[in-house]
Amino acid sequence: MASATDDRSVSTTRPMGDATRDAFGRALEALGADFPDVVTVDGDVGNSTRTEWFAKKYPDRAYNVGIAEANMVGVAGGLASMGKTAVTASFACFLLNNAFDQIRMAVAYPKQNVKLVGTHAGISIGEDGASQMGVEDVGLACSLPGVTVIVTSDGAQTRAATKAMLEHKGPVYLRLGRPKAPVIYDEGAAFEIGKSIRLREGGDYTIVANGMMVAMALDAADALAKEGIECRVVDMHTVSPLDEQALVDAAAETGGVVVAEEHLAQGGLGSRVAQFLSATTPTKMGFVNIGDTYGESGDPAGLLEKYGLTPEKIADSVRSLRG
């Protein structure tokens, strides 16, 4: 049975690279000298979120408040009010759920320069089970006005997004995964908050995805091309704010849009895309997500298969639009 750190923990033909949490940790450590106002606030899980790499290099800029996520976010908000760029990280389920009131009142409402980093997101964390799986985190973050929400797909993009996050003034939620991620981008590939990336051209349908589902979207598009169905693939890494022009173009120029994400059906990328397109450029839509349910313990590949987060399910969703 594959473990959550095995190279082949997701179903894709693409080579595997760094886990996005690892890429974030190394990027933060490397960027410390360029961003002297950055501090980290940890909830005693820095060895898992990888903030400990920054803390070991800059111990006088790192704070550990213990297993107390609400207090952790409050401290981060206070540091930001004193001019610091506060990076605070925990498992996605604990950060967004346990500290939501503090995120709302100490970060989002006052527009503090706090960077919230949720690791171990989705069901792909594997054996740890439902209590540890952040499957509603994007929806919670997107519900807060003014919070930028980013979901990266591979190591190279995460390194670029970490730098962009530190440069951005205001609250950011960065969602990261536990397992190794399929390689999508070359090192140094351009990344701009709020600007999606078109990875594949196609005039029949569009697949919009983020996170590890980007690799599966590309695999699905390759499979569909063999059937004569050409799909555009868009990496919508920023969930809030959406790249609205890319969505209008997709709806106007192709025959329908399928949204794939490792998140609950409600509140995440699919909900936001559907809400926007229904009001601006109505089109046929399909959705591939976890559904309206919690996860369970199991190996990552098996869980992704069970919950329908596969290239095959994405391809099936595209085919369903043809009727």
Q: Over which residues does each language-model region extend?
A:
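Thiamine diphosphate
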Residues: 1-175, 180, 190, ...
